[in-house]
A protein has these predicted regions:
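Glycine-rich, aromatic-flanked loop segments that form ligand/cofactor-binding clefts
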Residues: 96-136
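Shared catalytic-loop signature of beta/alpha-barrel
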Residues: 80, 207, 213, 224-243, ...
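Extended hydrophobic packing segments that form well-structured cores
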Residues: 352-369
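Metal-dependent enolase-superfamily TIM-barrel catalytic cores that perform enediolate-based chemistry
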Residues: 120-238
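Conserved, mostly hydrophobic/aromatic
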Residues: 49, 95, 108, 158, ...
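Metal- or metallocofactor-binding catalytic centers and their adjacent structured scaffolds
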Residues: 6, 45-110
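Structured beta-strand/loop patches that form or line metal/cofactor-binding pockets in enzymes
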Residues: 2-51, 57, 329-334
Length: 369
């Protein structure tokens, strides 16, 4: 059977608005505010008529369209070659995911079956939007209230994206309040995403995490998550595991953090490295006995989790007691984003259709193009 070639590439931008969200240094809830996000869709058609699709990404559609020449006329199954040629490109992952969708549709199996299926459902954690001034998620007690509500829904984990200011006392108080309320009943995490100005502040929060029994502390201070020495030092001084890697660019750099003993968990990023690159990190980490944790929500992340053993959770990202979903409503056949995407056991089902398993709501996408 001849290998199909890529015959046509279509890129379409669209926008979606999320009520109750604003951005001042970080995204957080604000009654009466609304933000409009921009992203797009990619359709890759092979000469056998099979179409690979990926929608909902947040890149400049012109940049995605500008990369089309690299792929047109090329073998549609050469994902590894495309990855090696463009792994530092910001749009490579979008094409990679669409090509995995195409390959799965050609074989009439989910993408995870091509990678090697390990499971078909995954546990999820609720990953909050940042703390705000006033309203829900503005105090340690309100974070604890939300953690308790998520526990009652079935969530097995809860991650705090804390306040966008650096008063470490409030961050410590929030860690302790959440730990006191639901500690021992959920895995607890905190992600300041490189907020704290000093090693000392990171250490204070880390020691609070120790006291509260947190599962991990992620990207604590403003080095950008890239200095192995300081994170190795922090690991020596606290018991709570570190999760690092989101802020560094390549799979190789993330693996280097592992080998430098600068992290306990490594952040995998399907949206940055594609399924091809994320699998490389997962398998490399597995050889040294460590886990990876995928970033963000979406169909590609679920296909990835279905194919790897050494990952613990699906991140249901940017949730809030009032604003329950920040992702565009573009999945017509599945519920895989937003606070309500879990079942009562805290699990999310991996889409089982061919490729990514997604039927897109093209009426919504076209209406917002």
């Amino acid at each position: 059977m001849p290998v199909p070639t890529i015959q046509k590439i279509e890129v379409q931008g669209f926008t979606w608005s999320v009520a109750g969200i604003t951005h001042r240094r970080a995204f957080h809830y604000d009654t009466g505010s609304s933000l409009t996000f921009s992203g797009g869709t990619l359709r890759v058609t092979a000469d056998n008529g099979v179409v690979g699709e990926f929608a909902g990404w947040r890149h400049d559609p012109k940049a995605v369209a500008g990369a089309a020449a690299r792929y047109l006329g090329q073998p549609a199954l050469d994902r590894e070659r495309f990855y090696q040629q463009a792994k530092r490109s910001g749009v490579m992952a979008i094409y990679d995911i669409a090509l995995w969708d195409l390959a799965g549709k050609m074989a009439d199996v989910p993408a995870h079956a091509l990678m090697g299926t390990y499971r078909t459902e995954v546990p999820a954690y609720a990953s909050t939007i940042d703390g705000a001034v006033g309203g829900p998620l503005s105090t340690p007690e309100s974070f604890a209230d939300f953690a308790e509500a998520c526990r009652d829904m079935g969530y097995q984990g809860f991650k705090i994206h804390p306040y966008a200011w650096t008063d470490v006392r409030q961050h410590v108080a929030t860690v302790l309040a959440v730990g006191e309320r639901v500690g021992g009943e959920m895995d607890l995490m905190i992600d300041p995403y490189c907020l704290f100005d000093t090693f000392a502040d990171a250490l204070k929060v880390g020691r609070a995490c120790d006291e509260a029994g947190f599962f991990w502390l992620e990207d604590p201070y403003s080095d950008g998550g890239i200095t192995p020495f300081s994170h190795t030092k922090l690991r020596e001084m606290i018991r709570t595991p570190l999760l690092q890697g989101e802020q560094v660019s390549t799979v190789e750099e993330r693996m280097a953090l592992i080998l430098a003993k600068a992290t306990d968990f490594a952040r995998a990023d399907v949206g940055r490295h594609g399924l091809t690159g994320a699998l490389k990190l997962a398998h490399a980490a597995e050889t040294v006995g460590l886990d990876i944790e995928p970033h963000r929500s979406g169909p590609a992340e679920l296909q990835f989790l279905a194919a790897v053993k050494n990952a613990n959770y699906y991140e249901v990202v940017w949730v809030h007691p009032v604003m329950r979903d920040s992702e565009p409503p573009i999945y017509a056949n599945v519920s895989i984003t937003g606070l309500d995407c879990i079942d009562d056991r805290g699990m999310v089902q991996v889409p089982e259709g061919p490729g990514l398993g997604i039927i897109y709501d093209w009426d919504y996408i076209n209406a917002h193009a």
